[in-house]
């Protein structure tokens, strides 16, 4: 069975690129035509590229590696939480903090601090502290949680990144490239495909398009796990936060 059909791609608007004045010439091989000043992406090529990306993700997960889902733009935030949660992988859906990959040990220390604050709260230790100090600790906890919740249990670097809009996530892309971590990405007509190992030519702005393509990569993770029942329910708190 096909991973995705042309009909599904069309219905989700995956074929709509950016305005013709906002494009990267390196994306020319993936453009079918232009219509009313908008580039139309060649979905036959998109289907093939989805299959390549799907098989790659399935393979690395089958080998025991993880995938980090990255999408901080508003159109992607909710989908990233839901789909990463569905397949039991890690995610970043708020601002990418510089060094999340290249300075991972420092990031781990911040995660340890978050876990320490969570433990203090759970044990009721906040109740014996002055109100001002509790307010400061809660503010610190909420800030750490906002940015690090999706990678809280990530103990080592991921085997790959799945990125929605590599232009927006250029710092994440640069860090992954520096470390030799393969990148799978939804690449619109204004992006540089040369920076990406497995490109999925497609609309990175429409919520339905982002959801369809991201869900297929989550499916690849689940297939790589061969049905292993490890996927938690989507993080409802993060879902609410993404909707806010």
Curated annotation (Swiss-Prot):
Q: Its gene?
A: rpsB
HAMAP family, alphabetized: Ribosomal_uS2_B
Name the UniProt key words of this record, in alphabetical order.
Ribonucleoprotein, Ribosomal protein
A Pfam family: Ribosomal_S2
Q: GO MF terms on file?
A: structural constituent of ribosome
Gene Ontology terms: biological process:
translation
User: PROSITE patterns of this UniProt entry?
Assistant: RIBOSOMAL_S2_1 (PS00962), RIBOSOMAL_S2_2 (PS00963)
Q: What is the lineage of its organism?
A: Bacteria, Bacillati, Bacillota, Clostridia, Thermoanaerobacterales
Q: Which GO terms describe its cellular component?
A: cytosolic small ribosomal subunit
- So what family is this one in? Belongs to the universal ribosomal protein uS2 family.
Q: Which Gene3D superfamilies match?
A: Glucose-6-phosphate isomerase like protein, domain 1, Helix hairpin bin
Task: Quote the protein name from its UniProt record.
Answer: Small ribosomal subunit protein uS2
């Amino acid at each position: 069975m096909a991973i995705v059909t042309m009909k599904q791609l069309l219905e989700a608007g995956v074929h709509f690129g950016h305005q013709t004045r906002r494009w990267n010439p390196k994306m020319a091989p993936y453009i079918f035509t232009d219509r009313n000043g908008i580039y139309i992406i060649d979905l036959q090529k998109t289907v093939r590229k989805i299959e390549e990306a799907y098989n790659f993700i399935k393979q690395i997960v089958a080998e025991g590696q993880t995938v980090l889902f990255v999408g901080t733009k508003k159109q992607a935030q909710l989908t990233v939480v839901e789909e990463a949660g569905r397949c039991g992988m890690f995610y970043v859906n708020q601002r990418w903090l510089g060094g999340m990959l290249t300075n991972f040990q420092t990031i781990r220390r911040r995660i340890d601090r978050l876990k320490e604050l969570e433990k203090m709260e759970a044990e009721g230790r906040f109740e014996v502290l002055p109100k001002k100090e509790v307010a400061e600790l809660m503010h610190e906890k909420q800030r750490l949680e906002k940015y690090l919740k999706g990678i809280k249990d990530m103990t080592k670097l991921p085997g790959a990144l799945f990125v929605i809009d590599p232009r927006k996530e250029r710092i994440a892309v640069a860090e992954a490239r520096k470390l030799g971590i393969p990148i799978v990405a939804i690449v619109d007509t204004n992006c540089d495909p040369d920076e990406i190992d497995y490109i999925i030519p497609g609309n990175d702005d429409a919520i339905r398009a982002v959801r369809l393509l991201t869900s297929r990569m989550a499916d690849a993770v689940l297939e790589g796990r061969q049905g292993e029942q490890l996927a938690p329910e989507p993080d409802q708190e993060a879902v609410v936060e993404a909707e806010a």
